[in-house]
Amino acid sequence: MDIKLRNCFLIVDDHDKALAFYRDALGFEVRNDVSYAGMRWVTIGPPSQPDIDIVLEPPAADPGISASDRALLGDLLAKGLLRGLHFSTPDLEDTFDRVQATGADIVQEPMDMPYGTRECAVRDPAGNLIRIIQARG
């Protein structure tokens, strides 16, 4: 069987702020930014991985979700309690400096981890935790 990841969804509360962060801080491409039926379909991704998209999705975009669940997702996002994404880079220091220069919320400065990587962590404008990892060795 040949199966590959095509896209993943990341909850954001402001498409424009999220686009600025991922485009300007991480150098991602904006692949789609289309409005339709009162929604906005936005996909981004690293230029080195053209076959994988990250869909920036508002909290509870599913029209069938209850108002209380929509509010709960919004609260979890605001508190930074939803899982984010992990990215790898060959130059963590340069990537960290670029992200820090945008004023991103720094959670962890670059540090060596006991399992063989060097990592930092930041929050995107929506509060998602983003880890950036460089293999050591």
Regions found by a protein language model. Give the residues of each.
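Vicinal oxygen chelate
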Residues: 1-9, 29-123, 133-137
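Short acidic-aromatic low-complexity motifs
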Residues: 12-16
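Short Gly/charged-rich anion-binding patches and loops
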Residues: 17-18, 94
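Conserved active-site tyrosine of GNAT-family acetyltransferases
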Residues: 18-23, 99, 127
